[in-house]
Amino acid sequence: MPDIDEIRQHLRSTGIMSKTHNLRLTSHPGPFNVLTSPRPHVVTNCVRDLTDHGDVFDMMNLSRTPYNKINIHIGGAYGDKESAMKRFCENFELLPDSVKSRLTVENDDKASMYSVKDLYYGVYERIGIPIVFDYHHHKFCSGDMSEQEALEMAISTWPSDITPAVHYSESRRKEQLDETIRVQAHSDYIYDEIDTYGHDI
């Protein structure tokens, strides 16, 4: 890669700055990263993209822990959630340690997809990946759990020495008062107080 030495230098400096100012750096690779896919070329491309994220974090000298998380949705259900989650766990083993040590998974915003409960029993119990609780997504894919129950289940998957990460957003439809906007779309601003239920997150 052209200018790789200069790139490494800037990334290393950025990593030092993040630690100096106590900034927690994380990433959220795009939705095309689908480790549940039954198509080998999709999985290969996913592994390549996630590896790039892990390499960048390594060049920044960030911790190989979920403190510096690389967070993804696990991908499609393909009509069989259980088989898809099993595939995800198998394909997880294709990832380098720079990714496996940082990878987290997040609950989805469609009822047909993955709730915190799905991820807990189908992924976390198999391979120990922490779950990032998304408050807004939970409204559309609750897994028959209350917000507090799902939050606390997700929190329980994190190492005890790392503050769990969560995602919080609100509905753009409500913010813009526009019924044509997908209710799952994120608002530009936060208006309500975030209920942590007494947890440090």
What are these regions, as identified by a protein language model?
Residues 129, 141-201:
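Histidine-acidic metal/acid-base catalytic patches
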Residues 111, 136-142:
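Short acidic, Gly/Ser-rich segments with clustered Asp/Glu that frequently serve as metal-coordination loops
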Residues 107, 133-135, 168-170:
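Active-site proximal loops enriched in glycine and acidic residues that flank catalytic Cys/His/Asp
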Residues 35-36, 79-81, 140-143, 176-177:
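A generic structural signal for short coil/turn motifs at secondary-structure boundaries
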